[in-house]
Amino acid sequence: MAVQQNRKSRSRRDMRRSHDALTENALTVDQTTGETHRRHHVTKDGIYRGRQLFAKAADAE
């Protein structure tokens, strides 16, 4: 079992944890379709930076 060499203070512990906070996804609105999507990601329609990268797949139902 691991045993600490020296006790860490609350300050040191909290400084280590300062990078553990979660951030919200950055969202943006597509200028052509008005759809909200994550930045630097392709929309559901297959559009990225104003270009159609692939056709939307038809539903399999």
From Swiss-Prot:
SUPFAM superfamilies per the UniProt record, alphabetical: Zn-binding ribosomal proteins
One term under GO cellular component: large ribosomal subunit
GO molecular-function term, one example from the UniProt record: structural constituent of ribosome
Disulfide bonds: none
Compositionally biased tracts (Basic residues): 7-16
GO BP terms: translation
Amino acid composition bias (Polar residues), ranges on this chain: 25-34
Entry keyword set: Ribonucleoprotein, Ribosomal protein
Protein's UniProt keywords contain Cytoplasm: no
InterPro entries recorded: Ribosomal_bL32, Ribosomal_bL32_bact, Ribosomal_zn-bd
Region feature Disordered, mapped onto this chain: 1-44
Similarity comment text for this entry: Belongs to the bacterial ribosomal protein bL32 family.
Name used for this protein in its record: Large ribosomal subunit protein bL32
Species the sequence originates in: Acinetobacter baylyi (strain ATCC 33305 / BD413 / ADP1)
Organism lineage: Bacteria, Pseudomonadati, Pseudomonadota, Gammaproteobacteria, Moraxellales
Gene: rpmF
